[in-house]
Design a protein with these regions (language model features):
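Feature activates predominantly on carbohydrate-active enzymes
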Residues: 57-91
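Ligand-binding pocket scaffold of soluble enzyme catalytic domains
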Residues: 49
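Short, charged/polar low-complexity linear motifs in solvent-exposed/disordered segments
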Residues: 14, 26, 70-72, 228-229
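Active-site loop segments of alpha/beta catalytic cores
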Residues: 1-16, 45, 54, 79-234
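Generic detection of intrinsically disordered/low-complexity segments and helix-coil linkers/edges
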Residues: 23-25, 38, 42, 46, ...
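Short aromatic-enriched loop/helix-cap "lid" or pocket-rim segments at secondary-structure transitions
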Residues: 20-23, 41, 56-58, 64-65, ...
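Segments that shape or occlude catalytic/ligand-binding pockets
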Residues: 3-7, 12-43
Length: 234
């Protein structure tokens, strides 16, 4: 093929992670039209009530370790309270961040804690990976992921309405530096249907959809394609 004259890079994108979504405070990753968070302001509860601890040395947060909220995915409805994005103060956030839309760059929503990362936050890592392959828990995980997809879609719609975004990046790490955390078959069965629902909704709204997914995940590329992801960002 021919050489392109120009290839988009992250410098061509302006992103927003507003404080109105408390996950961005909990994760220490709130970036909007105001000074960044101080270390002592980071951490605390996310929108599901899970407690995060900010680790200043690495500039990020982790769930408070050693006491996972959910030991069996079948119990998620008794343990987890789903947030209602309609209750967030979007109007005030929209007024604050209106100037960001005029940056001249593609404007994206960046959504932390995708489906698998959210499951990890509830169950810790070992519990989450086991739940993906445990026949006694998989139906419950499907049900939970379906509800999480609904919440993501509602939050995306709020970003469209109040910020006028052009695209969406969802963070969901699926691998380590050596290999994915799970097989392609598991990704196709447990994650792809819900990522595809989110991606398809973005496309219906005229947005591009990028999945940020750290790891040596080349063997999962067919899953990203089947999920209708436009860009895999590692």
């Amino acid at each position: 093929g021919e050489k392109p004259l120009w290839i988009p890079t992250t410098d061509d994108i302006m992103f927003i992670t507003p404080r109105v979504i408390v996950d961005n405070i909990a994760r220490g990753f709130a970036f909007e039209n105001m000074p960044p968070l101080k270390p002592e302001e980071c951490g605390g509860p996310d929108m599901f009530g899970t407690q995060w601890v900010f680790v200043e040395q690495v500039g990020g947060s982790m769930v408070r370790p050693g006491n996972p909220r959910l030991l069996d995915a079948n119990d998620w409805k008794e343990v987890i309270t789903l947030p209602d994005p309609d209750t967030f103060d979007w109007e005030s956030s929209a007024k604050l961040n209106a100037p960001l839309k005029d940056s001249g760059r593609s404007f994206q929503a960046m959504l932390l804690n995708g489906l698998f990362e959210r499951l990890i936050s509830f169950m810790d890592f070992e519990g989450a990976v086991m739940a993906l392959i445990d026949d006694d828990q998989k139906d419950a995980v499907h049900d939970l992921f379906s509800h999480l997809a609904d919440i993501h879609i509602k939050i995306i719609d709020k970003h469209i309405e109040y910020y006028g975004i052009d695209g969406v990046t969802m963070h969901d790490d699926w691998g380590s530096q050596r290999a994915p955390f799970f097989s392609l078959a598991t990704a196709e069965e447990m994650l792809v249907p819900y990522v595809r629902r989110i991606a398809d909704h973005c496309h219906e709204k005229g947005l591009w959809f990028q999945q940020h997914s750290c790891g040596k995940n080349e063997m999962l590329v067919p899953a990203y394609i089947d999920a209708h992801v436009d860009i895999w960002n590692g």
